[in-house]
Amino acid sequence: MTDLSRRSVLHRLAQGTAFISAGLPSLSALTSSLGAAPDHEAFWEMVRRQFPFREARVPMNAANLCPAPRVVAEAVVELTQDIDVDCSFNNRRKFTTMLELSRKQVADQLGVDSDEVALVRNTSEANNIINNGLPLQEGDEVLLWGQNHPTNNVAWQVRAARFHSSVKRVKTPTEPTRIDQLVEPFEAALGPRTKVLALTHVSNVSGERLPIRELCELAHRRNIHVHVDGAQTWGAFNLNLRELQCDSFAASSHKWFCGPKEVGLLYVKRSRIAEIWPNLVSPGWGSDVNPDVKGARKFESFGQRDDARLAAIATTVDFHRRLGFDRVEARIFELAGALKSGLKAEGFRLVTPEDPKLSGGVCIIQVPPEKRGEVLNRLYTRYGIAGSTAGGLRLCPHVYNTMAHIDRAIGAVREMRSMMGQA
């Protein structure tokens, strides 16, 4: 790429104008060409072509890691090269503008204010900022879901061991059929010393979806801080965190959001920011106890960051916006629904609820623990589908998957029936 074209790309990125890879039709043009039927399978076939993976190795593990669309990957490369060509303060000054653009794009996507958003490194870090930063006293209780990720589970136990708070885990039904079955166990467990309710929006080990708004309303009547691990919903659901009513929310760019690796999200409600201490303090913080940075930015005071990846977050939001946030969610539910119903029709037992009100894009098939590794390896080497052994055989389709991929997955599982212990 010439210096002139590189400057043009960087200018468009700085102005928040995303671009689509050379030779690929823009998503807006594609939508227009299909008229009022963007749910047509041809539309999603074209979306699939925005991602560089080979048909011989199809990713279906969005709960862990997603490929980035070409437009995002190329933005990261171009921006990194720009820094390497000229790493002066003079040249890098523009990345401050780009960072704030990314922050605003994410905030707008999630229905919150820019000052409530910190761009950290991943969900684990965001969870730990809340864990270590909330001002808990000896004897205070943290109530958490038993299916939380270790960074929103064991991390609380580690803090309790250090500072003499307590942790209580809530177990929910393994086969829920109603939302109230997921609310009642938490309501029964809340006590006079409960200060934090730590939840997961959608479990990565069962696919179960918690009714977050109902649980927030329940907790807030007792002035309890509600923290939500949203690793399985940012980029998968059309989220509005204001409507969700949580006090803090953590997620990663590299999962369903399909963004740059090693960038994460921490949302903290404005009224809660002041009471939470940061994990790290660097020159970006300022020169005394009171931070110079405004709002949730104090939680991202890490020193030198990968400016290119942070800037490319805006490109990723724009990619989702072009597709349509609601359309992305609907497509994920369509694919997951087709996968679950197809597996159920074949007689397979699922860990994940079929009801979309009780689940999301995560789909887990029952497989004995001792067989999971072999099943996963066979699925990848023989059938070209990448999944996970979390909770069984986990398959998590995304917008880059097609109905043909779903059919391939169902066919592969059918052929592995005896290996999976579901004769």
Which residues does each predicted region cover?
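Pyridoxal 5′-phosphate
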Residues: 2-423
